[in-house]
UniProtKB/Swiss-Prot annotation:
The N-terminus contains the mRNA 5'-triphosphatase domain, the central part contains the mRNA guanylyltransferase, and C-terminus contains the methyltransferase domain. It comes from African swine fever virus (isolate Tick/Malawi/Lil 20-1/1983) (ASFV). Pfam families: mRNA_G-N7_MeTrfase. InterPro entries: CYTH-like_dom_sf, mRNA_G-N7_MeTrfase_dom, RG7MT1, SAM-dependent_MTases_sf. S-adenosyl-L-methionine binds at residues 607, 624, 646, 710-712. One of its GO terms (molecular function) is mRNA 5'-triphosphate monophosphatase activity. This is mRNA-capping enzyme. Its EC number is 3.6.1.74, 2.7.7.50, 2.1.1.56. Induction: Expressed in the early phase of the viral replicative cycle. Residues 594-868 form the mRNA cap 0 methyltransferase domain. One of its GO terms (cellular component) is virion component. It catalyses: a 5'-end triphospho-ribonucleoside in mRNA + H2O = a 5'-end diphospho-ribonucleoside in mRNA + phosphate + H(+); a 5'-end diphospho-ribonucleoside in mRNA + GTP + H(+) = a 5'-end (5'-triphosphoguanosine)-ribonucleoside in mRNA + diphosphate; a 5'-end (5'-triphosphoguanosine)-ribonucleoside in mRNA + S-adenosyl-L-methionine = a 5'-end (N(7)-methyl 5'-triphosphoguanosine)-ribonucleoside in mRNA + S-adenosyl-L-homocysteine. PROSITE patterns: RNA_CAP0_MT. PANTHER family: MRNA CAP GUANINE-N7 METHYLTRANSFERASE, MRNA GUANINE-7- METHYLTRANSFERASE.
Length: 868
């Protein structure tokens, strides 16, 4: 692509080219992304200025010819004359506010008559030409294109619609005579009519801006805004590919900057205690970048805010990241990108922060209302000290703004790779959605109307790659709301469908709400209540500061991952006290030590082998899924839909976190759609079954398989629990569906205790190098295995030396109950039978498998049952 200056120079040379003396030389400016509303806006603006105009009608037949040199010619018969139109050069303005504006240089030459065939494109044109000066004319054209069989079928009808209107066409009545509902194309072109030698590139830019200002009075401001983002990006990004996304407008400010992550308990556990981190308050402002560029001082946020000038002398650039209060024009800096020409993006935050205050002082020197956010460096792991640190920031009364949370900043990483987390009280956790009114007449039961409410659908942004890896589908009505071109992008809107609440994207908006025109807007919303099959949402505010990001076509509210991880704080609330003491209820928080390596590898191998038996099934339910230890195995098996059920909210939150981790770091041949249900499996089977069947898309006939790995001992307290489990499995499975249990075998445990003469409250131990590796504490006195209710204490690899109590599983009784409820036993097998296969799988791990490991593994087995 040529530069604009080169194109203008080539245009001028064409008039001295003797080979072109019989050609018409055209320099045109075309706008490529024109819809009816934009067309009408420009048309009416030109009419209002009473600019001289003429109306013309034409029918042109076009035949496109492609040569070996890839030069395209258009052959155009007009008034029985035949021409070929050959493009020579073009220049395209890159800024998105220019609506794909393109400057084209072409020549038109007369040729001999050619044969019209079915490949010819027929274009009917209704054109109004406005001669805005001696140098330029603006042509606004309504076009109908016909091809092939359409020509004979529709040509006469559209000729009547476009040309033979009931009234004589004038510029003033044109837009009322043409029906915009028909599938017309709309073109705006500017043609140069002045002396070739007088034209400059600046003239082209000026006339282009004139038309764009008719479309949007803020065009020049939008152009300046985009140029400011480009300036910032040039100091942050090194990748030409990413810089091109900024220049094209596909990325706006939000996609450029590193985002603050909503912190979950699982996030916090990874670095608790947060020694070395920096903490500051979170203000309820908008993200903004303060810039000193030459003599200009401005903030780039939802728009461009000019804060003044430095005077005559230009300064070296300073770029600060922070929060901006537009009403008061106050800037609160929390990071620095560049200070007086020194790029700091590769330094750790602990170094960057030293220049942040210096940058703030530069702003203050020019009477800008700016200050550095107050940071505390966390140096102690003592919970009491941490509590005082957090309270001193969060509960401070002297800040000039309302504090709605805390920010934790990780040291040691570059600007783009610095992990920054925000913590908010549950009430202040909000999400940003692109809101669209639900199309009518969809006949979707889940979209049932409610009197006094209008149904809207909530959308967030997602990459095409993540969309595929999470096996998501577009909701009913999606194709009516978003054009095909948008759906084919690398980043597009998707309904907000978290794993634990697939219908969370439904929002019933009260007709009496003070928020009226919300369709197509980005709204900040909070969850008031989670009901059986929908969420009660409350609008906090319309994100007017995000409208410009929305126009880029690359922003649709929060990113899907960000939104779901924020949503976890409704599912598993994170209290202020837990910041100091550490998250409570973390599921099996202890880590396994190296001595368990071979034994845990063996158990993992066995579970992998079992799950592979159900590979590629459509719907699978995991009872007691915990934090998703088997998630990778389900993904490897290509399960299409996985429903995980557990009563531990914190464990389920960790599972969802793992869902995204697998999607971004591991490669799987098949995608799995993951649903989670927070549910105590000891509750009545009927209630649980109803909840599962309410999961969006769950088949009426039931799932293909139910899996429960090392969980059912929790449901062996009494026979009623076992009966309830059997009923639940029957209700959730399709006929012929399978149940797969792995469990510690009660019969084998009792045998081990008898062999070693372990009495009540005594402990059987297996040691390795004088370290207790496995242990079972006998908590019952009966000598024979009871149907239910016999407890033992178990020392687990991840229990940090503590015993976990569980019930012995009487497998004979379990199978008996399942048979009574319509199941047949397919297979029962001890884990020890897999040891030879494990040796083949990994000779290295098998060699370090000890006798204690083998003894412990022999206590476990699996049971497979089929629903009759």
């Amino acid at each position: 692509m040529a530069s604009l200056e080169n194109l203008v120079a080539r245009y001028q040379r064409c008039f001295n080219d003797q080979s072109l003396k019989n050609s018409t030389i055209e320099l045109e400016i075309r706008f490529q992304h024109i819809n009816f509303l934009l067309f009408k806006t420009v048309y009416e603006a030109l009419v209002a200025q009473e600019i001289p105009s003429t109306i013309s009608h034409s029918i042109r037949c076009i035949k496109k010819v492609h040569h070996e040199n890839h030069c395209r010619e258009k052959i155009l018969p007009s008034e029985n004359l035949y021409f070929k139109k050959q493009p020579l050069m073009f220049f395209k303005f890159s800024e998105p506010a220019s609506l794909g504006c393109k400057v084209s240089l072409a020549i038109e030459q007369p040729i001999r008559k050619f044969i019209l065939d079915s490949s010819v494109l027929v274009r009917l044109k209704n054109r109004t030409t406005f001669q805005i000066s001696d140098l330029w004319k603006i042509e606004l054209t309504i076009v109908k294109q016909l091809m092939g069989s359409e020509v004979s079928a529709k040509l006469t009808a559209f000729k009547t619609l476009l040309f033979d209107t009931p009234e004589q066409q004038t510029a003033k009545n044109m837009m009322t005579l043409i029906n915009p509902d028909d599938e017309y194309l709309y073109e705006i072109e500017i043609e140069y009519t002045g002396k070739p030698e007088s034209l400059t590139a600046a003239d082209v830019i000026k006339i282009k801006n004139t038309v764009l200002t008719l479309i949007s009075p803020n065009h020049l401001m939008l152009t300046a805004y985009h140029q400011a983002i480009e300036f910032i990006a040039s100091h942050i990004l090194s990748s030409e590919i990413l810089l091109a996304r900024i220049k094209s407008g596909k990325w706006g400010l939000k996609r450029l900057l590193p985002q603050v992550k909503s912190m979950t308990k699982a996030d916090y556990m990874k670095f608790y205690p947060p020694v070395g981190y920096y903490v500051t308050d979170k203000a309820d402002g908008i993200r903004g970048i303060a810039v000193i560029q030459d003599t200009q001082i401005y903030v780039v946020a939802d728009q461009l805010y000019s804060l003044g000038t430095t005077g005559i002398e230009p300064l070296k650039p300073t770029i600060l990241d922070g929060e901006f209060m537009p009403e008061k024009k106050e800037f609160y800096g929390f990071d620095v990108i560049m200070y007086e020409g020194n790029l700091l993006t590769q330094q750790g935050f602990e170094i960057r922060i030293e220049s942040l205050n210096k940058g703030i002082k530069v702003l203050q020197a020019f009477n800008i209302k700016a200050e550095m956010k107050p940071f505390i460096s966390l140096t102690s792991a003592d919970p009491n000290v941490l509590l005082k640190n957090f309270e001193s920031v969060f509960k401070k009364k002297t800040r000039p703004y309302a504090i709605d949370g805390l920010i934790l900043v990780e040291p040691g990483n570059s600007y783009l790779n610095t992990n920054t987390f925000k913590w908010k009280p549950t009430w202040d956790n909000t999400l940003d959605f692109l809101v669209r009114k639900c199309p009518e007449s969809l006949n979707v039961p889940e979209y049932a109307p409610k009197k006094g409410f209008s149904l809207y659908l909530l959308f967030v942004g997602i990459s095409g790659e993540l969309f595929k890896k999470l096996a998501l589908n577009w909701c009913p009505g999606y194709t009516k709301l978003f054009p095909v071109t948008q759906r084919n992008q690398n980043y597009f809107p998707v309904q907000f469908q978290p794993s634990d609440f697939p219908l969370a994207f439904l929002y019933y908006h009260p007709d009496t709400s003070s928020f009226s025109d919300i369709d197509g807007k980005v709204l900040e919303m909070r969850c008031l209540k989670r009901e059986v099959n929908h969420v009660s949402w409350e609008i906090v505010k319309i994100r007017e500061d995000r409208q410009q990001d929305l126009k880029t076509g690359g922003y649709f509210g929060n990113d899907f991952k960000t939104a779901e991880l924020t949503w976890l704080n409704y599912m598993d609330p994170f209290s202020f006290e837990e910041l100091a003491k550490g998250p409570s209820g973390m599921y099996f928080a202890g880590a396994k030590t190296g001595i368990y390596r071979a034994q845990t590898a063996l158990i993992s191998f066995i579970k992998q082998e079992i799950i592979q038996k159900i590979s590629h099934q459509s719907w699978v339910i995991d009872l007691g899924i915990g934090k998703g230890q088997d998630l990778g195995r389900y993904l490897d098996a290509g399960i299409r839909h996985l429903v995980g059920i557990d009563k531990d909210q914190t464990a389920l939150a960790e599972l969802i976190y793992r869902k995204f981790s697998h999607a971004t770091t591991r490669q799987h041949k098949h995608a799995t759609n993951i649903y989670v249900l927070h549910q105590d499996l000891a509750e009545p089977a009927k209630e649980i079954s109803e909840k599962v069947h309410q999961i969006y898309g769950f088949p009426k006939e039931g799932a293909s398989s139910i899996v429960s790995n090392l969980f059912i001992h929790y449901l062996m307290k009494n026979s009623q629990q076992v009966e309830n489990l059997a009923v639940l499995c029957h209700k959730l499975l399709q006929p012929g569906g399978m149940v797969w249990f792995t469990t510690m075998l009660g019969e084998r445990v009792l045998e081990l205790l008898h062999e070693n003469r372990i009495e009540l409250n005594e402990v059987w131990e297996a040691r390795e190098n004088e370290v207790v590796k496995f242990a079972i504490k006998r908590l019952f006195k009966e000598d024979i295995l009871q149907e239910t209710g016999q407890e033992i204490g178990v020392l687990l690899p991840f229990s940090n030396g503590d015993f976990y109590n569980e019930y012995l599983v009487n497998t004979a009784f379990l199978i008996k109950i399942f048979k009574h409820h319509g199941f047949s036993l397919v297979q029962m097998q001890s884990f020890k039978d897999w040891i030879p296969e494990f040796q083949t799988f990994s000779k290295t791990l098998y060699k370090i498998l000890t006798e204690a490991d083998k003894t412990w593994t022999s206590l476990f087995g699996f049971i497979c049952l089929r629903k009759n």
